[in-house]
From Swiss-Prot:
Catalytic activity: (2R)-2-phosphoglycerate = (2R)-3-phosphoglycerate
Gene: apgM
EC number: 5.4.2.12
GO biological process: glycolytic process
Molecular function terms from GO: metal ion binding; phosphoglycerate mutase activity
UniProt pathway annotation: Carbohydrate degradation; glycolysis; pyruvate from D-glyceraldehyde 3-phosphate: step 3/5
Stored PANTHER family: COFACTOR-INDEPENDENT PHOSPHOGLYCERATE MUTASE (PTHR31209), METALLOENZYME DOMAIN-CONTAINING PROTEIN (PTHR31209:SF0)
Family: Belongs to the BPG-independent phosphoglycerate mutase family. A-PGAM subfamily.
Protein name (database record): 2,3-bisphosphoglycerate-independent phosphoglycerate mutase
Species in which this protein is naturally found: Methanococcus maripaludis (strain C6 / ATCC BAA-1332)
Cited function: Catalyzes the interconversion of 2-phosphoglycerate and 3-phosphoglycerate.
Top-level taxon of origin: Archaea
Phylogenetic classification of the source organism: Archaea, Methanobacteriati, Methanobacteriota, Methanomada group, Methanococci
InterPro entries the record matches: Alkaline_phosphatase_core_sf, ApgAM_prokaryotes, Metalloenzyme, Pglycerate_mutase_ApgM
Amino acid sequence: MKAVIFIMDGLGDRPNKDGNTPLKEAKTPVMDKMAKEGICGLMNAVDIGVRPGSDTAHLAILGYDPYTTYTGRGPFEACGVGVTVKPGDIAFRCNFSTVDENFTVMDRRAGRIENTLELEKELDGLKIDDVDIIFKESGGYRAALVLRGPGLSDKISDADPKKEGKKVKDINPLDDSKEAKKTAEIVNKLLKIAYEKLDKHPVNEERRKQNLPVANMIVPRGVGQVPEIMQFTEKTGLKGACIAGTGLIKGIAKMVGLDVIDVEGCDGTPNSDFMAKAFAIVKTLEDYDFILVNVKGADEAGHDGNYELKKEIIERIDGMLDYITKNINKDEVYIAMSGDHSTPIEEMDHSADPLPIVIWGKSVRVDDVEKFDEFSTYKGGLNWIKGTNIMPILMDLMSIAKKYGA
């Protein structure tokens, strides 16, 4: 038996004034068919009432306790874009952002700039005091930053003010150690250098001519040291792969030992080639026991408050599932389908609202649920579970779970 965990990033939502969500209103005949043929329920990736990041959510969904394995998003982001992180490295995720001359943030995502490779070159390879700067763009406005050198610490604050109209925050040490103080000073120096190098860069001068937000600042957050994590194959006995478009999810996969399958045209944006990803899933199942799949577009739409786009993306994902379910053997493959978190249109951010989940395959106890949405699956046989329950349930269905006790 094989298994797929199919995650629609940012899937869940809250009802609008008409009582609808993008998922409830979307035309999703395949998801609904899977709900009718599967066992359904509700799922909180980390815990009830906890707003998860995509990082902690995916760790939990893969069966890892995020409270003991998560050190910050930075190491995963860096790993996902190909940086070989080492013990002692301090890693951050970053946004390219638009700031004024006072470092007040005008656009947190620099107008969702698409190509930042030339800007990356201005920062990657710098050396500040005795610390090497490794900087890699990770798709659009996202990037990863790694500090490598002696005497560093991850006990420092973030620069992200979280909202536009506020200044980029000074980095401060969070304890009294000389390592934290040194690291904070290095990052503060880097931010000043970044503004000086990026503000008048030809890429940004051209964006000004087009009245587009410039990418003249990097805003580090999610600092962390590289965690020690048991490898997925050792933990489960399964040969695992990951198909995802974003650097963060690829980084999590690499960190736990999943093979990352790159799919041309899949970059983690709403414009990704969803069907190419569907074809890759079916093909990859020929060689692997397990696949983690992440499809990102609905989350982007939620963050932008775009109801219609989120609905459209969910319908496109349904088309993916049509191909997948028609081209795999239901007697040989289980699919656990859900989201990693809700990204409600009204919040334009992650929330703790539970997600619909269905497990589809030959030996599940089919329940009475007939539609896959936030308002229907609570009636299902899975009841209300956490993300860390998914892998044990799948392994039990696959007859590879170890017995607890005599």
